[in-house]
């Protein structure tokens, strides 16, 4: 799997949200609404999610193994850090 495009939309404001991201995988599949969030230990990438009826949030799309999550996070954060 290769992430072939990353689009970053930085967010100005007083919240922990730093950017909203779209990625394209293998020039064939797009995932929108990933979020870069400032956590206690630095930035992390949150997957697209929706609030359920009981108030909890559930991922709409997510990696199924740690290697894929690490790849997505690295590529997205590298791009975020290179954008002014």
Spell out what each predicted region is.
Residues 1-84:
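Single-stranded nucleic acid-binding surfaces, predominantly the OB-fold ssDNA-binding core
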């Amino acid at each position: 799997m290769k992430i072939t495009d990353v689009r970053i939309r930085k967010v100005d404001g007083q919240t922990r949200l730093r950017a909203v991201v779209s990625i394209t995988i293998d020039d064939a599949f797009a995932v929108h609404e990933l979020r870069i969030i400032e956590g206690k230990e630095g930035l992390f990438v949150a997957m697209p999610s929706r609030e359920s009826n009981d108030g909890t949030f559930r991922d709409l799309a997510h990696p199924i193994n740690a290697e894929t999550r690490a790849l997505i996070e690295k590529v997205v954060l590298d791009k975020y850090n290179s954008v002014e």
